[in-house]
Amino acid sequence: MAPEENGTCEPCKTFGQKCSHVVKKQRAKFYILRRCIAMLVCWHDQNHDRKDS
């Protein structure tokens, strides 16, 4: 099993470094999720407006 698969980072030795690494990964995932939701909402609004016209 690769170190990245089980959530550990081999070069990160301290608990604080591990937490920082996990937080950065989660923030990146959350950012992508937010962007996808915003894109879908805008797409839905545009399609809804076209149907009303």
Swiss-Prot record:
Q: Where is it made, tissue-wise?
A: Mostly expressed in stems, flower buds, flowers and seedling shoots, to a lesser extent, in roots and young cauline leaves, but not in mature rosette leaves. Barely observed in cotyledons and leaf primordia.
Induction: what does the entry report?
Accumulates in seedlings within 6 days after a shift from dark to light.
Q: Where is this region: Required for DVL/RTFL small polypeptide activity?
A: 14-45
Q: Name one GO biological process term.
A: regulation of cell population proliferation
Q: Glycosylated where?
A: N6
Write the record's keywords in alphabetical order, separated by commas: Cell membrane, Developmental protein, Glycoprotein, Membrane, Transmembrane, Transmembrane helix
What did gene disruption experiments reveal?
No visible phenotype.
Query: Entry's Pfam families?
Result: DVL
Q: Sorted alphabetically, which InterPro entries does this protein's record hold?
A: DVL, DVL_RTFL_regulatory
Q: Name one GO cellular component term.
A: plasma membrane
Identify its membrane topology class: Single-pass membrane protein
Compartments, record wording:
Cell membrane
What are the transmembrane regions? 30-46
State the source organism's domain of life: Eukaryota
Task: Tell me the protein family, please.
Answer: Belongs to the DVL/RTFL small polypeptides family.
What is the protein's known function? Small polypeptide acting as a regulatory molecule which coordinates cellular responses required for differentiation, growth and development, probably by restricting polar cell proliferation in lateral organs (e.g. leaves) and coordinating socket cell recruitment and differentiation at trichome sites. Regulates the positional cue and cell proliferation along the body axis.
> What name does UniProt use for this protein?
Small polypeptide DEVIL 16
The species this protein was found in: Arabidopsis thaliana (Mouse-ear cress)
